[in-house]
Amino acid sequence: MEKKYDVVALGEFLIDFTPAGSTDSGMKLFEQNPGGAPVNMLTAVGKAGLKTAFIGKVGDDMHGNFLVETAKQAGIDTRGIVVDNTVFTTLAFVTLDENGEREFSFARKPGADTMLCYKEVDADLLRDTKVFHIGSLSLTDEPARTTTFQAVREARKYGAVISYDPNYREPLWDNRENAMERMKSILPFVDIMKLSDEETALLTPFEDPKEAAEYLLGTGVRLVAVTLGSEGVLICSRDGSRKVPGFVSHVVDTTGAGDSFWGAFVSQLIRADKSLEEFSIDELEEFARYGNAVASLCVEKRGGLRSIPEESETFERLTVK
């Protein structure tokens, strides 16, 4: 049965306030950037020419209205975005070190994204997508946590491949133990997932990327990607594992790097139009290289969503050996 959407995602949609220099008097300046890992991921999918939609909640405020308009401009179907006048849009303040690595401070007590109820979800979006993508930030608080599980079950019932990116953000969890428990709780439903080499010990008994990926495959996940920062990514499937080197970048801001990689990688899985078990490790390596090219371009600009490159730029980067 043909599906209307290639990827539908559920989760946080927020503002990343990223450093943008200082005033003449030395006060810090911050730039308003649309962000949120699921939407960054969808944007990368859309750059590959595929159809996407987002499910989430924003506040009926200047930030929420800006986010809805930004999603529309990115070609993301916004019918699943709830605009609520009783809560504020979630805000993230990002600080960057000399290597472009980030630390976060959040205004989310509660943020609109945590207040999404299942009765507000357009179930047609769940039933009409090839891939349904989630992160773990919708698992931090109720009612969004229950909504996430209900949405995953519904999408799965209608044949969607379930995609998961834990995207651990320590300040948003009450403690590490709860974070680990809840991030693991979704694994029985997951078909494909991406995690970073800093998250392996949170989701598995292993820190080593290869051991962690093999453990996840053993739990029933069908394809695992472990991002390794500037070193690239490790891809693991039933056909084997392979480390795929990254591209040399002039790093400005790593926000959205993993999201853009995963969106680009998943877009290639969808384009190939095969079941997950049919992919050889050689094919997956090719898709990972495409994803690495997208991520390498993403980190050369500030912000997440708006730093994701056009596909023509990606093809140009892919010519670099």
Predicted regions and their residues:
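Glycine-rich phosphate/adenosyl-contacting loop at the front of the ribokinase-like
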Residues: 1-77
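Conserved phosphate-binding/catalytic region of the ribokinase-like
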Residues: 1-6, 153, 209-321
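Active-site metal-binding loops of divalent metal-dependent hydrolases
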Residues: 13, 37, 137, 166, ...
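Conserved N-terminal subdomain of the carbohydrate kinase-like
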Residues: 51-134, 315-321
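Conserved beta-alpha-beta core of the PfkB/ribokinase-like small-molecule kinase fold
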Residues: 140-214, 231-232
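Glycine-rich phosphate/pyrophosphate-binding beta-alpha loops
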Residues: 16, 90, 136-140, 295, ...
